[in-house]
Amino acid sequence: GPPWKVGAVKIARHYKWAFTKLFDNFSPDTPAAIVVEDDLLYSPDFLDYFHAVAPLVEIDDTLWAASSWNDNGFDYLVKEPHALYRTGFFPGLGWLMTRELWNELKHKWPQEHWDHWLRQKRQHKGREVLFPAMPRVFHNGVKGTFMDRKTHEKYFARIATNRDEKVKWRVPRAYGGGTDGSIGEIAS
């Protein structure tokens, strides 16, 4: 088949292998994993962000993941480093996979295009993904299975990323979840 088709199959198999090794073989007590790719650059608060939002994914049944990416996080649109949103669309690119979600998905993991598959209602079941207005990763790759310089320049080059080392996150004390949309006190 075409190179992108072969690549899509290899990537889906690789993710399944990695999640199986992590959750089912190596770390039976690990509650979640942050999934990253080799062509991402990270904000100074990347790990702090996930430390703050992981408990939200754990306690809120209307969430199924957290991402550090915002497809609409263009540098001319986003200025607030603490703003968080919810979406029904899986953003990917630096995201949190929980053990609970893996246990739900592992027996039906797709043969290709795992990210598009996760966006299907049968998988997310109406649950949402938490993500920052200002991304915590920057997509740096210009060559890959689904990437070339033209695509990168068109869709990724103008995406902002937090560069402020002073941004701090706290684990939330209060959280409104899906009811009123409030996030509680997680930024300082």
Task: Label each region the model flagged.
Residues 13-16, 44, 116-120:
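A structural signal for well-ordered alpha-helical segments within the folded catalytic domains
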Residues 28-30, 60-63, 127:
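Short, high-confidence coil segments that cap the C-terminus of an alpha-helix
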Residues 35, 65-67, 96, 129-133:
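A structural signal for short, well-ordered beta-strand segments and their strand-loop junctions
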Residues 43-116:
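Conserved catalytic core of nucleotide-sugar-dependent glycosyltransferases
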Residues 110-188:
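C-terminal catalytic/acceptor-binding lobe
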